[in-house]
Amino acid sequence: MPAVSRPLPPLTALAPPELEWRADDISDAPYASAYGDVYFSRHDGRAETGHVFVEGNRLPERFAAWRETRAFVIGETGFGTGLNMLCAWACFERHAPAEARLHLVSTEKYPLPRDALARALAIWPDMAARAGVLLDQWPEPVGGVHRLWLSSRVVLDLHFGDAAERLSRLDGRVDAWFLDGFSPAKNPDMWQPELFAAMAQVSRPGATFATFTCAGVVKRGLRDAGFTWRKTPGFGRKREMLCGEIAAPPDDRRRASTPWFTPPRARPARHVVVIGAGLAGTSVAAALARRGVAVTLLERDAPGAGASGNRQGALYVKLAAETNPQSRVYLAGLLYTRRWLTALDPEQRLWQDCGVLQLAPGDKEATRQQRFLAHHALPERVLHGVDAATASQAAGTPLDAPGLDYPQAGWVRPDRLCQQLAASPGITQRRGEAHDLDFDADADAWRIALTDGSTLTADHVVVATAHEAPRFTPLAGLPLKPIRGQLTHVPVPADAPSLARVVCAGGYVAPAMEGVLSLGATFAPGDTDTAVRTTDHARNLDEFTATLPAFAEALRAAGVTLDPAACEGRASLRAASPDKSPYAGPVPVREAWLDDYAVLGADARRVPSTAGRHHPGLWVSAAHGSRGLASAPLCAEVIASRLCDEPLPLERELIDHLHPGRRLIADIIRGNATRGNATLSTSSPNDDAQPSPTTTETP
């Protein structure tokens, strides 16, 4: 039967290592007390890295000869101080062609605190520039994948957690391995058969490895996993080390228990058309252009004209009390978006990391938040609970309710962000509306028919048109529901009281920007009218005054008019999936899935071996709902990474959770799937078939 997902652990901060600082031949160096071992050679750690890992994998010659369009991928067990990865980066820049790209993947169970990392890397002043880039993006110690762009050509994916477990969930293939970590005698838990099997599973044919140790457990583990090894001279006092390769690793693409999620094989990506220039589309376009792909961005209006055209949007997420895939995706997305925005706009012209307070004004939400805090233990810099007094101090106004504080979250200008992304080098903007898509098998290309009669051709097409995606024939049946949301804009004078945080409850209010206070937003599933309504302004203002009564009264005292008839605003449509998670990935061939997996409707235990069939080069990013600022940039990386044959920025099961075919396979199993172009019902058993009455929802 379809695989049962492994239980997801709580969202917690990883423990830091127990460190001592001991003098060596160069300076004071970190020493792992729990393992009784050093992080790098006391004599010359950088020289050891060069000898063992860089030369052991023949990186200078391989980089110099690299001509493939995909990135060269290095995998590492044990990031430690990052010395190995920084040396690989330096070697790549010295030897690789200008158009080559490098992708680094490293695991770490006990991430160093940032100040300890800085102290360790300060031993080598000539590495300060690269170390500074790493330190500026150093992630919080949260288990999972953290993607860092070290340069325009170099990406680092940090997988925080146990090495074997993290590699078993890696979605990607590796060209060269740095098999590092504390010695097998002092850290036997890492050097287990599961580690070597996971390495083999995600190795490309001919992948190499190098390691400092010749321990028997390592030689046996490598051999049993399919690697061949040989002894070569070691570094310094170590007489020998191991190098080797794996000629024929297993096919990592195929999902044995969920074959429908088998990723499509890579195809050339000379030209990609992205349809839709909201945040989903512009994020994908920019991610592809960053990788050197020629992109045409097709939009019937200006970039950011739809639901992404709001003046301000809250950058935060609402995490479930119990761990689920959706919460893990959104948490990873929130952390990625913050790093991404920091690199994109360090002056914060497009965003502010002022923090977000998610209040609990009623017993139900207060109970839910208490359950969350009891189950999870994230770093305080990411999320922590606050009482009403602490929340009041953080917000800069009296509050009556406790809540959750996201100190690194904030607000973003989605309209300006879309415009900046659309103007990225490598993107050609095209004004027009796509009528339909058709794959020309003879030309091995997509033809995009425009309403003006013209046609575009492309190797790949990414559809990012929110609830309108199913109007394209290959996406007919993709369950998406339009949701109307209206924001209210209240003019405020420069000397009016101000908020220090975005405050969310039933609705939200952001700190005033350019003399306007933005609050909302209404939530009306199934309503597609975008005309601004005074009644919705009234609803937003009622929610605002109920959530922030003292602040509302202070505004009135300052002469601010809170009259719905005098307010301006904006209404737009966002899209949601039935399970409230985004779609990001390849588009399944619906009729093929109905045929290939029909047996599941009679017996879910009879899983066919047939790999899922997808439309070649067709992708979708949609259903970002009211959390698109946290999900769209990371989903763009998911699509760009898969399209460019790179390791993905999420665990394998979370990639599958985002798959656009997840509802289709669920309906096949339940016997609810339909043939033809009929759109699946987007209602859950408890949903009303008619458009819901307007309510308010935090963005």
UniProtKB/Swiss-Prot annotation:
Role noted for this protein: Catalyzes the last two steps in the biosynthesis of 5-methylaminomethyl-2-thiouridine (mnm(5)s(2)U) at the wobble position (U34) in tRNA. Catalyzes the FAD-dependent demodification of cmnm(5)s(2)U34 to nm(5)s(2)U34, followed by the transfer of a methyl group from S-adenosyl-L-methionine to nm(5)s(2)U34, to form mnm(5)s(2)U34.
Cofactor(s) essential for the protein: FAD
Disulfide partners: none
Encoding gene, per UniProt annotation: mnmC
GO BP terms, alphabetized: methylation; tRNA wobble base modification
EC numbers: 2.1.1.61, 1.5.-.-
UniProt entry keywords in alphabetical sequence: Cytoplasm, FAD, Flavoprotein, Methyltransferase, Multifunctional enzyme, Oxidoreductase, S-adenosyl-L-methionine, Transferase, tRNA processing
Primary localisation category: cytoplasm
Start and end residues of each stretch annotated as Disordered: 675-699
HAMAP family (alphabetical): MnmC
Localization per record: Cytoplasm
Molecular function terms, GO-annotated: flavin adenine dinucleotide binding; oxidoreductase activity, acting on the CH-NH group of donors; tRNA (5-methylaminomethyl-2-thiouridylate)(34)-methyltransferase activity
Protein's name in the database: tRNA 5-methylaminomethyl-2-thiouridine biosynthesis bifunctional protein MnmC
Region (FAD-dependent cmnm(5)s(2)U34 oxidoreductase): 275-699
Residues annotated as signal peptide: none
GO CC terms, sorted: cytoplasm
